[in-house]
Amino acid sequence: MIKKIYKKYEIIFNVVLFSIFPIAAFYLMEFYEHNPFEEVRFMAAFFNIILFELIAWILYFVTGRAKWALRTVFIVAMVFGLINHYVMLFRSTPFVPWDIFSIGTATSVASNYDFAPTAGVVVVTVIFIALIMLMHFVDFRIKWKFRFRLIPTVLGILALCLFVNALQDEDFQTDNYLYPFLFTPAYMTKVNGMAVTFAMDLKFVAVDKPDGYSRQKAKELLDSYSGTDDNSDVANNTAITDKSDYPNIIVVMDEAFSDLSVLGDFDTNTDYMPFVHSLEKGNENTITGYLNTSVCGGNTADTEFEFLTGNTMAFLPVGSIPYQQYIKSTTPSLASYLKSIGYATYAQHPYYGSGWNRDTVYPLLGFDNLSFMQDYSNQRFVRKYISDETSFDRIIETYENKPDGQPAFIFNVTMQNHGGYTDTYYGFDNTVTADKLNNSALDQYLSLIKMTDEDLKKLIEYFSNVDEKTIVVFFGDHQPNDTVASSVLAANGMDYNNLSNEELKLRYQVPYVIWANYDIDEAAGKDTSVNYLAANVLKAAGVPTNDYQSFLLKLQEEYPIISAVRTDKTTDKTLDKASNKSDKAIGSKNKQADSDMLNDYKLLQYYRLFDWEDK
């Protein structure tokens, strides 16, 4: 009887059975990171299921066998869920489409992270594997030849493409309560689900031209800022007119260097950065403040990109890596500009040159002399990475061997403080402990920061005794990941998983120092963002700025901070904080002019990054 009923309704039974598995795959994948029944919005969950169903049925028509189609869906979902979980753990942001370009870099540093699975990860993975094995019994097939299966396959692919296109439509997102804001990617993934968010993000793999853009318009706009920089103003007596008197410019972008006290108070057994703290109190020929970054816990290359080019990640997809996605030919930068006015240009990084494509990108940015791990002599290691002491010795060695009479621009990116911070290492002991926080990762991190602080002091002491004018710039690329910062946040009443917008901004601040061995204007507590820093360095150094840098200095007067996380606007000498959707919140009588400046920035950035004449 049962067999007869099954035979009669076999197709319906198989369709229902087949359709249940993609739903299970979606919810299991989400459980790697959170409880989707509580946090994924209803319509978003429905759309995730549609994506899974479409992919499963396409695979069924391609393979002709249910078990292989379903196994493929489950394996992909399991791998995707695991990747997203560990990316969130180590970087505090979800896996996005352009992370695929970063696989090589991620692999090169993976050994220094703790991949020990939590109980939840183990349970979800076991369920995945059990269901994959159970699919051995779900083995109904399509008996059609492939040429007959081709039509439903093509129709399925077309339906999938149309549906993904709908998910990327702003009106569709609004009508169906999908969260659209890329500048909070973790929350976006949490409430939309991984698959829907990934599909929405695909729209931003390529960067569209800004409204009203033309190369001629951008060139004319850039020309309008020719000769407008402070250092070319007759009233400014700090400008250096003799090129032979240009100072050496040494820039250290230090891996994960930050002062976590910006998140709130916590006590330690000793000061973890006494030298930097002393400079921040006010020091001769020194400028200090906080630098607002676009990244946290990773994606170092984005901070490099913003500093060297003056461009901002605010106008690019969140999580994108310009070094890997956009810089494919000659691109104007601080290095190419300084080279054009007579500087010798050096880029140094004590790790693999292939990381973030640096060995390819640096020459395109104008660096003539490259040094990577194999070029460092007398290597000393801290944990698994070449020490900052070794890295700073390389700077001194480069300075001492540069051509006589030619100023040097040395850009040095360190590795010593790279995460993770949970393993123990022979020969490395924590010298700093945070009282009552019971976080060994935090203790290790602070101990590393103290070592860097000591090495920075030695570097500045060296250049304080050289005859040539030299300016040293030091800043961190980003704060460490949540494993380190969570206990500091918790001690100050904050949950790292549920930070308010104002609290989130604190996670994107690092200290910076501009120091010179000759007279420059001093300042303390001067906050800025990475895109402005190079122009500010040239202004402080007395080196003339080019047209784009002059524009940035002017823009900075109205928008002192622009990053992927925040855009702060000055109105009547006060600072209005807003998100990077801030055009709607300005509300001043100068709104149109201010918006025009931001639009000009978008035009100029697109021109210099994607439409430069030398490309």
Regions found by a protein language model. Give the residues of each.
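Membrane-interface segments at or immediately adjacent to transmembrane helices
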Residues: 165-251
